[in-house]
Amino acid sequence: MPHDAPEHSHTGISPSGHPYRADQDAPLSYFQNMEIAMRELLSEKGIATEAEINAEIDRMDSRSPADGARLVARFWVDPAFRERVRADASAASREMGFDIGALRLIAVENTENVHNVIVCTLCSCYPRNLLGFPPDWYKQRAYRSRVVKTPRSVLREFGLDLPGDVQVRVHDSTADMRYIVIPARPTGTADLNETALAALVTRDSMIGVARAQSPA
């Protein structure tokens, strides 16, 4: 069919070398149909308007690893807050204004001798309220099954080769209990403020497959 778009390849690969996203032409799934039916029912019953539902979706979509990074940075610089996170990470998160819902959040701290990594072996439970949407690899069966059995091997695939004397602990998230890794504070950051420290904290470091970045 003729069109006026610029010349492009039909190999499925973009000029930058990345594959084009597949067309979403398949019929709606069971869960998609259920979502539509639920939205209509909530509206018909006067429980929530379409605008309220969309606002909540926008609020959830706006969450990102930057929220978790702020919590980690404050953990590093504020001894009193650090103890509150250790005692009740859910309450400490709410203290910073993060709405994490009713779930129980547990912070696991990396040290010189212990490295933590999180997974959900059953599905893809993830601290979305602090980190946003999980990466695709976190949801894949390969990661979920292998990181429990051979965590060091999986971490090496992410470029993280831990010394043999460092203990690796794998934490399995559930529907009502989530984990966040507090990465070890990088050396050479004693003079950095909380905002600068938060910029060093990555999503992967809060999952446990990477370290926090070193200052430039």
Question: Each PLM stretch: what is its role?
Answer:
Residues 2-216:
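Terminal, compositionally biased segments used for targeting/anchoring and flexible tails
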